[in-house]
């Protein structure tokens, strides 16, 4: 399953881990995705949404 937000489309980014001696190692920054039950087209569906979208209220949670 792709590490991508179902609402905003945020996905992984690449960058570097930089040590104290400034040695750079490539790494991946992944979005903080959480499974959320929400209603899409009248159906309760479980989607993976980033926490930024959850905090912004872009997703309405449905109780199981």
UniProtKB/Swiss-Prot annotation:
Record's GO cellular component terms: ribonucleoprotein complex; ribosome
GO biological process: translation
Keywords: Ribonucleoprotein, Ribosomal protein
Natural source organism: Bifidobacterium adolescentis (strain ATCC 15703 / DSM 20083 / NCTC 11814 / E194a)
The protein's name in its UniProt record: Large ribosomal subunit protein bL28
Pfam families the UniProt entry points to: Ribosomal_L28
PANTHER family: 50S RIBOSOMAL PROTEIN L28, LARGE RIBOSOMAL SUBUNIT PROTEIN BL28A
GO MF, any single term: structural constituent of ribosome
Record-linked InterPro entries: Bacterial_rp_bL28, Ribosomal_bL28, Ribosomal_bL28/bL31-like_sf, Ribosomal_bL28_bact-type, Ribosomal_bL28_sf
Assigned protein family: Belongs to the bacterial ribosomal protein bL28 family.
Domain of life per record: Bacteria
Key word Mitochondrion present: no
